[in-house]
A protein has these predicted regions:
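Non-globular, low-confidence helical/coil segments that flank catalytic cores
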Residues: 1-169
Length: 169
């Protein structure tokens, strides 16, 4: 977990390094072998919550796709829906550990994930929130948490198939 002071110190250190080309995500597409990584636009400056400055990625490998959203909450998810950058995906890494403040019906209607993985451990925040889990279960064929399954590895294939491996709680 970062603090605002730590975050600002990191940014200042990066700014002092001349080999750094960019500091924040700029919307772009990166080709990586047979895969494509789409870096989503950031919210315009002004959000008070650093979670809503998370980098969003859509990873595509042929017919397999994954949406990775970091700690994004409703404000950033709504922004991405409004920007029309949320595609149908095979896999969704649940935003903000499955928090109630990080899921909207509009976002899920756009993403239509087959599998949702919630990265979460024992915590005092109540993550994942039962309402968020219920929303994921309404659209996805499978909802998994790392608290229950341990490490979750998804192997995606270009024909759209995928394998799920779990273990090591």
């Amino acid at each position: 977990t970062h603090t605002t002071v730590t975050y600002r110190e990191l940014i200042e250190t990066l700014r002092q390094r001349t080999e750094i080309t960019y500091l924040v995500a700029e919307p772009r597409t990166i080709q990586l072998g047979g895969a494509e990584i789409q870096v989503l636009p950031l919210l315009p400056p002004g959000s008070a919550d650093l979670n809503n400055r998370s980098v969003g990625l859509v990873v595509r490998y042929g017919a397999f796709s994954a949406f990775l959203s970091g700690d994004s909450e409703i404000e950033e998810l709504t922004f991405w829906v409004d920007q029309e950058v949320v595609p149908d995906v095979t896999l969704l890494k649940a935003p903000h550990h499955g928090g109630a403040d990080a899921v909207t019906s509009e976002f899920l209607e756009r993403a239509q994930p087959e599998v949702v993985v919630i990265s979460v451990g024992v915590n005092t925040y109540g993550h994942p929130h039962p309402e968020a889990v219920q929303a994921y279960e309404a659209v996805a064929d499978m909802v998994m948490t790392t608290r229950e399954q341990g490490q979750v590895t998804i192997l995606g294939y270009s024909d759209g198939r995928y394998e799920i491996r779990t273990g090591g709680v």
